[in-house]
Amino acid sequence: STLLDTLKKYGNTCPVMISSSTQAALDNPYGESKRAGEQLLFEYSRETGAKVLVYRFPNVFGKWCRPNYNSAVATFCNNIAHDQPIRVNDPSVVMHLVYIDDVVDELISALSGREHRNGDYCEVPVVHTITLGGIVELIRSFRQMPGTLSVPDLSDAFTKKLYSTYLSYLPEERFSYPLKMNVDDRGSFTEIIRTSDRGQFSVNISKPGVTKGQHWHHTKNEKFVVVSGHGLIQLRKIGTEEVVSFEVSGGRMEVVEMIPGYTHNIVNLSETEDLVTFMWCNECFDPARPDTYSEKV
């Protein structure tokens, strides 16, 4: 009321925004206090003609929210990231949430007169609905991902936002996690990321003069990108004699496709430097079904 009285005193009819809550609809002291603040703005608008924007925000989540206070998402992210216990009284409770970046986008739009309205109230147009149990299940899956080299399904907008939120609560000692390097006298092969529907991402290192590969696949396919060193990639269609060759280097990166039905290899042409190759494969390696058959190019 002090702000509104001051604006009226000086005849300033600039727009006024208030951050309220969906709990303003509840019949409890907190809800009553929120409704009282809203009504002050609506009365001020009727009296002065000034534009008012009343946002009833649902649960807001995102990085830097204080855990163990009034945000279940912040508490769950923080405690699970730190291997601390959580309590879920009723996992079937339905939550309506808005992401902090979406809130900021809406308020920036409101500054330009492009707010989203629903009757007397303004709103953030992107609201995510999920059960409390569903949130916990997702966050717990995030905690396990470094051990399985997996990543979330980022095609789902809420999962993408929740994963970013979860990462912001990681203790610093978990910013990094080790990878298993499969090392032999030829170099190494290291899986980085494994996905259920987008294949596998790996790094291959070949020592000077080493040839790797010399095999083909029925269905499995790969993309090779040399990021350091100087090498030769060769492919030959099974049952034919013609060899297709690509001289590659980290100085001019390019993708070379490993085509199903073509035996292929990769040769480190350097006598002194390792050949470092980023590799994508359309499926994660399954030792029970390797789909890999030895044959020299």
What is each model feature region?
Residues 2-36, 45-48, 53:
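Conserved Rossmann-fold NAD(P)-dependent oxidoreductase catalytic core, especially the SDR/UDP-sugar
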Residues 39-64, 84-90:
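Conserved beta-loop-beta element that borders a ligand/cofactor-binding pocket
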Residues 58, 78-98, 117-118, 123-124:
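A conserved pocket-lining segment of Rossmann-fold NAD(P)-dependent short-chain dehydrogenase/reductase
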Residues 65-75, 92-112, 133-137:
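Substrate-positioning beta->alpha
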Residues 109-180:
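Mid/C-terminal beta-alpha module of Rossmann-like enzyme folds, strongest
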Residues 173-214, 220:
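A short glycine-rich, His/Asp/Glu-containing loop-to-beta-strand
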Residues 237-262:
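Short acidic-glycine-tyrosine-enriched beta hairpin
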Residues 239-242, 267-297:
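Double-stranded beta-helix
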